[in-house]
Each structure stands twice: as structure tokens, then as C-alpha cells.
Regions:
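Short basic (Lys/Arg) and small-residue
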Residues: 100
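Hydrophobic alpha-helical transmembrane segments
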Residues: 1-81, 89, 93-95, 105-125
Length: 125
């Protein structure tokens, strides 16, 4: 949407909203193209969302089950953003870069554990 290296002019109203949507889709496209984990998690969501709709015991349970899947995607996008910024800063090893990347990875892991817990509770208890 924006040329690399060029800062877009400030926008207001509908123009700002349309640009925001463009940036959103740019981010989704970039994450999909560059992150295998995001593609795998998206595939899992595409497969599991209909399972939640079919087997979920009620509307709230279905919403929570699908919401837990979407949370994994959100956290993966944030993790990818962290990794991208850390990688841009430099290629040499740095303890702070390691901590940032490890924390992002841990956040994705916790979101995945959340899916398991939510689904077990919704389907079996």
C-alpha cells in the first residue's frame, strides 16, 4: 500500500480507515508469505473452526472455542512482528534479542495450550 521508504501523508476520516485496512491486509499477506508457523496455524483454524461449530455444546462454547483458535493467530502475528524488528536490528547474537524472540515463542506456546484447555473443557466437562 505504501512505497518502501516513503512515509504516507496524514489522513483523516474515510481515507484513514481505508489506509488502515490496506495496512492490515499488507500485514496479513506478509505474515502468510514469510511465516510457515502462521500458515500451519491458519490451516488448523480452517479445519478446527467447523469442528467447533458442529461439536461445540452451545453458542457460547462455540464462540470461546473459535476465539481460542483466533488468539493463536493473533499471538503468532505479534511474535512475527517481534522477530522482524529484532532481525532488522542486527544479525549478531545478543541476549536481549534472544530474550525477545524466546518470549514471543513462549506466548505462542501458551496460546496453543489455551486452545487445548478450552477445547477439553468445552467438549468433555
Amino acid at each position: 500500500m505504501t512505497e518502501p521508504g516513503k512515509v504516507p501523508d496524514k489522513a483523516t476520516g474515510l481515507t484513514r480507515i481505508m489506509r488502515a485496512f490496506g495496512y492490515t491486509f499488507d500485514g496479513l499477506k506478509a505474515t502468510f508469505k514469510s511465516e510457515a508457523a502462521f500458515r500451519q496455524e491458519l490451516l488448523a483454524c480452517v479445519i478446527l473452526a467447523p469442528v467447533a461449530l458442529y461439536y461445540g455444546p452451545g453458542g457460547i462454547a462455540k464462540a470461546v472455542m473459535i476465539g481460542s483458535l483466533m488468539l493463536v493467530l493473533v499471538v503468532e502475528i505479534i511474535n512475527s512482528a517481534i522477530e522482524s524488528v529484532v532481525n532488522r536490528h542486527g544479525t549478531e547474537w545478543n541476549i536481549h534479542a534472544k530474550l525477545a524472540k524466546d518470549a514471543g515463542s513462549a506466548a505462542v506456546f501458551i496460546a496453543c495450550c489455551n486452545v487445548g484447555i478450552v477445547w477439553l473443557l468445552c467438549l468433555f466437562f
